[in-house]
């Protein structure tokens, strides 16, 4: 468990539900205690409200708090403070000597004060979560969150009406009723630009749903049941507060477009690419993603990938398998993206590549193999190869420069191989060459040692 979070049970519980991979769950005893004290804690609306109340700086706060080490013993702190007072009251000590003696005791007091400061931050946050819980429960009891238009649509469907498309965008919705999942004939659902914090699990009942627009809401997580939408082709969750996508999303095998941009994602599900084999467009820009899962290389249908403004450290070695990829934007990953794998040159259909605002110094030697590349942006990189004057010309100029560089490297390698082979051959047959030279000298009338020689007979030129 995170450092000392046992004393902040509510915070511990919410952190685990917001990011299970980074935060361990509270002990069973604490979970039972929380269930008794907060009976609606598992309600989707309530837990989403609590997750939303967690500040984005909590990760840094917990990291610093955890790196402080053990808290000083209270008796040691009290003793240190007494010693500091004694030193200050001792007039016989010079200011320099007093400062030296105070230094050891001041370190103990300072560490205690830092602990107190961070613990107060977490305690205040624990209390704030409690207040948010009370407010969320009160909102639930109000019963006025379900829009009348939503209820009318559901009633129409229950009365036998055929409802294929629902557009409830800009309706200030706070929640969707469970009964929405009963509209089995629904093909398109647009609930963008509302105040939704969660989706009901019953959304899995929309078996024919092909388009789902959840953009510009306040969602902090997606239900696992979303993986049961087997006919879903377009999913838009941009502009929410998602910190992760459920593993079950890989089961949406019909998905063609996924827009998860402008969230708080730090990673993608490990199995992401194994299921989404039909995905053509993936937009994950404006997140905090550091690495792509290796499974993304299995998404052979992918044509468009936008991952700009993240914290991408590099691409998987097998990225070259995305042979249908046409557009890739990796710009503005700043100090995190410093190199590209050689396999990027296997992206045979790549037409546009944006690598601006990174820390790339050298392009892969095989970069010239991107024959279809038309647009290349390398602005704001500390490039050494190719030189900036080539970069300023065109993608074709860069490609041609890298081609010539490659040919020169091949020639150098071939020459090196020939020289190495001759060295090895010379070492293995040196005695034979020496013996042959003596025989040649004798037959030609010369002497071994450099005297003038007559023309050699041609048969002596044959390899022994």
From Swiss-Prot:
Widely expressed. Residues 106-138 form a coiled coil. Belongs to the SHOC2 family. The keyword Transferase does not apply. One of its GO terms (biological process) is microgametogenesis. GO terms for molecular function: protein serine/threonine kinase activity. InterPro entries: Leu-rich_rpt (IPR001611), Leu-rich_rpt_typical-subtyp (IPR003591), LRR_dom_sf (IPR032675), LRR_domain-containing (IPR050216). Leucine-rich repeat protein that likely mediates protein interactions, possibly in the context of signal transduction. A motif (GVYW) lies at residues 398-406. Keywords: Coiled coil, Leucine-rich repeat, Repeat. SMART domains: LRR_BAC (SM00364), LRR_TYP (SM00369). It comes from Arabidopsis thaliana. PANTHER family: LEUCINE-RICH REPEAT-CONTAINING PROTEIN, PTHR48051. The keyword Aminoacyl-tRNA synthetase does not apply. Pfam families: LRR_1 (PF00560), LRR_8 (PF13855). This is Plant intracellular Ras-group-related LRR protein 3. LRR repeats lie at residues 160-183, 184-206, 207-230, 232-252, 254-275, 276-299, 301-322, 323-347, 348-370, 372-393.
């Amino acid at each position: 468990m995170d450092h000392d979070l046992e004393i902040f049970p509510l915070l511990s519980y919410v952190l685990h539900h917001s990011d299970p991979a980074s935060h361990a769950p509270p002990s069973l005893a604490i979970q039972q205690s929380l269930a008794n004290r907060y009976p609606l804690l598992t309600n989707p609306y309530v837990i989403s409200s609590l997750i939303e109340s967690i500040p984005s700086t909590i990760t840094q706060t917990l990291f610093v708090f955890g790196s402080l080490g053990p808290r000083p013993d209270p008796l040691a702190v009290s003793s240190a403070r007494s010693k500091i007072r004694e030193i200050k009251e001792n007039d016989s000590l010079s200011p320099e000597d007093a400062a030296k003696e105070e230094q050891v005791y001041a370190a103990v007091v300072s560490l205690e004060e830092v602990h107190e400061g961070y613990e107060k931050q977490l305690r205040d946050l624990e209390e704030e979560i409690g207040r948010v819980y009370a407010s969320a429960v009160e909102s639930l009891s109000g019963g006025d969150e379900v829009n009348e238009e939503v209820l009318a649509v559901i009633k129409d469907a229950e009365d036998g009406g055929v409802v294929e498309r629902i557009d409830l965008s800009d309706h200030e919705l706070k929640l969707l009723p469970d009964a929405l999942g009963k509209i089995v004939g629904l093909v398109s659902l647009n609930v963008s630009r509302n105040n939704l914090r969660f989706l009901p699990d019953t959304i899995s009942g929309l078996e024919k749903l092909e388009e789902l627009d959840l953009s510009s809401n306040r969602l902090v997580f997606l239900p696992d049941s979303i993986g049961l939408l087997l006919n879903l082709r377009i999913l838009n969750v941009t502009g929410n507060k998602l910190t992760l996508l459920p593993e079950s999303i890989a089961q949406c095998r019909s998905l063609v477009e996924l827009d998860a941009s402008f969230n708080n994602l730090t990673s993608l599900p490990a199995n992401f690419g194994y299921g989404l084999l039909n995905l053509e467009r993936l937009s994950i820009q404006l997140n905090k993603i550091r690495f792509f899962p290796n499974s993304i290389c299995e998404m052979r249908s992918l044509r468009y990938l936008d991952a700009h403004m993240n914290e991408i450290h590099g691409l998987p070695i097998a990225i070259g398998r995305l042979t249908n990829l046409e557009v890739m934007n990796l710009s503005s990953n700043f100090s995190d993206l410093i190199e590209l794998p050689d396999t990027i040159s296997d992206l045979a259909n790549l037409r546009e590549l944006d690598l601006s605002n990174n820390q790339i110094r050298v392009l892969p030697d095989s970069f010239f193999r991107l024959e279809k590349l038309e647009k290349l942006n390398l602005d704001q990189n500390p490039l050494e190869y190719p030189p900036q004057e080539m970069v300023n010309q065109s993608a074709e100029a860069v490609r041609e420069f890298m081609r010539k560089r490659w040919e020169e490297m091949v020639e150098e390698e071939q020459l090196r191989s020939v020289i190495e082979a001759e060295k090895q051959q010379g070492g293995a047959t040196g005695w034979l060459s020496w013996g042959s030279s003596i025989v040649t000298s004798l037959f030609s009338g010369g002497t071994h040692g450099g005297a003038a020689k007559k023309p050699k007979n041609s048969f002596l030129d044959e390899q022994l």
